[in-house]
């Protein structure tokens, strides 16, 4: 299938043949949800930790005798019912990672890219290059393409410090190379702009 290419000025600049298996896949909302949740869960640190009654320091001696005081019996001052005592169901470090195999991951990315294209939220440009790190110049490119809340995806060799510096101060705008794209970044932005090189690299990765 052929897709239209735009110049950075927003004008038509030819067409590009792309793989239907990547850009014409069926929309699978359940798969996308599962992969996105798994991806975000894997980003959790899971380092929260509390101490149980056996881990809190002190409390080795019985605070008062078993009978005769009129008070409730107690064996340690580090019981959860005491101030400075341990926690009843103490949280411990854990991993929140969920297993996602390669077929599921690539299927979710294909589904997202295809839906972006079908809904008119994907734009393809010849290349994205800036000679100097100027936010004003990058903003003019965004305005010319008529996109907002946008993720720019460029080829690995196309990514440069100028692109990063020019875009980092713009709200709801991000730039990454084709290796760094993931289901979360693709669904977080309203629009996606890809260069020809990025598309070829994505196809090599997913086909």
From Swiss-Prot:
Domain of life: Bacteria
GO biological process entries: translation
GO molecular function, one term: structural constituent of ribosome
Record's keyword terms, sorted: Ribonucleoprotein, Ribosomal protein, RNA-binding, rRNA-binding
Region (Disordered): 48-70
GO cellular component, one term: ribonucleoprotein complex
Keyword check for Ribonucleoprotein: yes
InterPro entries to which the protein is assigned, alphabetical: Ribosomal_uL4, Ribosomal_uL4-like, Ribosomal_uL4_dom_sf
General function of this protein: One of the primary rRNA binding proteins, this protein initially binds near the 5'-end of the 23S rRNA. It is important during the early stages of 50S assembly. It makes multiple contacts with different domains of the 23S rRNA in the assembled 50S subunit and ribosome. Forms part of the polypeptide exit tunnel.
Protein's UniProt name: Large ribosomal subunit protein uL4
Gene from which the chain derives: rplD
């Amino acid at each position: 299938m052929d897709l239209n290419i735009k110049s950075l000025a927003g004008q038509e600049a030819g067409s590009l043949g792309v793989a239907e298996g990547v850009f014409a896949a069926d929309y699978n909302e359940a798969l996308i949800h599962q992969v996105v949740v798994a991806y975000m869960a894997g980003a959790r640190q899971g380092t929260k930790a509390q101490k149980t009654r056996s881990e809190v320091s002190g409390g080795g001696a019985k605070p008062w005798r078993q009978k005769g005081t009129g008070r409730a019996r107690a064996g340690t001052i580090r019981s959860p019912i005491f101030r400075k005592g341990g926690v009843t169901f103490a949280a411990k470090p854990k991993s929140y990672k969920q297993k996602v195999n390669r077929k599921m991951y690539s299927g979710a990315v294909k589904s997202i890219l295809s839906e972006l294209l079908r809904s008119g939220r994907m734009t393809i440009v010849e290349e994205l290059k800036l000679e100097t790190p100027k936010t004003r110049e990058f903003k003019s490119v965004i305005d010319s393409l008529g996109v907002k809340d946008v993720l720019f995806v460029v080829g690995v060799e196309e990514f440069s410090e100028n692109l990063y510096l020019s875009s980092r101060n713009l709200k709801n705008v991000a730039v990454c190379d084709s290796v760094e794209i993931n289901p979360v970044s693709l669904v977080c932005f309203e629009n996606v702009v890809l260069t020809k090189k990025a598309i070829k690299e994505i196809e090599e990765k997913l086909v």
